[in-house]
Curated annotation (Swiss-Prot):
Molecular function terms from GO: ribosome binding; rRNA binding; translation initiation factor activity
Keyword Isomerase recorded: no
Name of the protein in question: Translation initiation factor IF-1
Predominant cellular place of this UniProt entry's protein: cytoplasm
Similarity-based family: Belongs to the IF-1 family.
Residues of the S1-like domain: 1-73
InterPro entries: NA-bd_OB-fold, RNA-binding_domain_S1_IF1, S1_domain, TIF_IF1
Species assigned in the record: Rhodopirellula baltica (strain DSM 10527 / NCIMB 13988 / SH1)
Subunit structure: Component of the 30S ribosomal translation pre-initiation complex which assembles on the 30S ribosome in the order IF-2 and IF-3, IF-1 and N-formylmethionyl-tRNA(fMet); mRNA recruitment can occur at any time during PIC assembly.
Amino acid sequence: MGKKEEAFEVEGTVTQALANTRFRVQLETGNEVMAHVAGRMRKHFIRIVPGDKVRVELSPYDLTKGRIVYRER
């Protein structure tokens, strides 16, 4: 396997649930991104609803899309 790209994580709040396990997330920085659920979260049936605090992994190449990697308790 190759080295993973240098993605960075930010905290945010889910504002809207969309189709195909996509969500609109308001980041702490004030930006809003589209994010999908990571495969391991889908595998373990972790549910995400609007209002949840989540950790989003963003690629440095496209800061408008992300991947939800953790849901705060």
